[in-house]
């Protein structure tokens, strides 16, 4: 029987995070609270299956994600499920991913979202698919096999674009990568946590040059 844990980096997502946590009580969950200024930390008393790791300062999504993965690779879980705190990923995606793991035992699963939110994200994904047969590299919904992740990031020092760099490591190491189609909801209309649409597009262009 595989053991699964869910990892959720979160910054000022109290309302959507609460909704998510209320629907995944059957799983062990770790939330990396990235120095939120709302009442996210108060949720720790409402969900006994959730461990809250509170950052003393805001370190950003990718650093928070890496911190969580480093913590969980030392735990006795077979797979680590990552998902976003903004409600973009449907809860049904979790069960779908779990079932895929039980049938195929992949090293990594990528959740192919039904919608993408940025023009450059769509373009990048199409090119990425042609080269690597991976449809949605920027999806925050992924499932990592813990023993493989532990080996691949043993001596890894986080880089500026960890999110795409980790995927690159899995590809170059010829790991077994699978994918599932997942339903995705529209992200709330608010300022991006990483600097707005212009800076996100610049980030994707840089990732494109870095990866190819």
What residue ranges belong to the model's regions?
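Short, well-formed alpha-helical segments that are part of the catalytic scaffolds
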Residues: 7-26
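Conserved catalytic loops of nucleotide-sugar-dependent glycosyltransferases that act on lipid-linked
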Residues: 64-65, 116-212
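Conserved donor-nucleotide/metal-binding helix-loop-beta segment in metal-dependent transferases, i.e.
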Residues: 93-109
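Cell-envelope/extracellular polymer assembly enzymes that use nucleotide-activated donors
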Residues: 3-5, 165
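Acidic helix N-cap motif at the loop->helix transition within catalytic regions
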Residues: 15-19, 38-46
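A conserved acidic beta->alpha catalytic loop
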Residues: 33-42, 87
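Short beta-strand-to-loop acidic/aromatic patch adjacent to the donor-nucleotide binding site
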Residues: 77-88
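Conserved donor nucleotide-binding strand/loop of the catalytic core
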Residues: 42-74
